[in-house]
Design a protein with these regions (language model features):
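Active-site cradle of extracellular carbohydrate-active enzymes
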Residues: 2
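Acidic/histidine-enriched, glycine/proline-rich intrinsically disordered or flexible terminal extensions
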Residues: 106-132
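GST-like fold's C-terminal all-alpha helical module
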Residues: 5-98, 102
Length: 132
């Protein structure tokens, strides 16, 4: 399940982010491709979580690695509608020791993204990286 994140969710969500939020041109077929594939992978996780409390059976690095991407689904434009198992797991992950502290390293992006001016600055800086 860690490899599922490394070879599936990580790359697909990363590209969904780039093309949905940061790429200078909006290329809808590309955006759709990455968002739809991310959604399909979310459905795989949702099915796995229908019979397991944690992705690999017991709480593990697989949960942490996958959660880092699942929790950003809105930012990437990926719907979690109808994925109750995945949504419950995502919310339960916030309660795990160290998770709230960890997502604030190196900066508290969730706070930044709540402020429109800070959000614009964050996107502008990310777009600079995409253009390189």
């Amino acid at each position: 399940w860690l490899m599922f994140q490394m070879g599936g969710i990580g790359p697909m969500m990363g590209q969904a982010n780039v093309f949905f939020r940061y790429f200078p041109e909006k290329i809808q077929p590309v955006i759709d491709r990455y968002q739809n594939e991310s959604r399909r992978l979310f459905e795989v996780l949702d099915k796995q979580l229908s019979t397991n409390e944690w992705i690999a059976g017991e709480y593990s690095i697989a949960d942490i690695a996958n959660w880092c991407w699942v929790r950003t689904h809105n930012w990437s434009g990926v719907s979690m509608d109808g994925l109750e198992n995945l949504d419950n797991w995502k919310n339960k992950m916030y309660e795990q020791p160290g998770m709230l502290k960890g997502i604030k390293v190196p900066v508290d992006r969730e706070s930044i993204l709540k402020n429109d001016e800070d959000k614009k600055e964050f996107i502008k800086n990310a777009q600079k990286m995409v253009k390189k």
